Amino acid sequence: MHSTVRPPVALPPNFSSTEFRDALGMFATGVTIVTARNAEGVFIGLTANSFNSVSLTPPLVLWSLARSAGSMAAFSAGSHYAINILSADQQDLARQFAARGNDRFSGVQFVEGSGGAPLLQGAAATFECFNRSRYEEGDHVIFVGEVERCAHRTGASPLLFHGGKFYTEHAL
């Protein structure tokens, strides 16, 4: 019997970047704002939907950031950051932290977490994380955070993102 062994590499994609993005958009996600304080003491933050739990023991979460992001150096060098899961009524905040060239914290109410990262008022949940590890993959860096503190608002409805639009939850 004769078999053909394929080399252990991925085949090149048979789709465009746009097709890939459109397919990924079919996966509904929550919306987060990741915040930190840089080495100069300036607050930084950005909107991200690339958030996931990793482990319960120890408590680990992950999120990813484009290598080309202006805040990459600050998030890579910092010891702590916070992940704020947005509530259904915070879509304007999601847009504010996604926009470029503005003061993202203008008019935003928050308290500083124990590691110095802003915890946004009204968030459905917050995770205060130690910057445990980073992994470079493709055009992004995956950040793994060890959760030191977390909180959630009982009964809060999360902000959802699907197909390029914001939604709120509705039970089936």
Mark where each language-model region is.
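Basic, polyanion-binding surface patches
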Residues: M1-L172
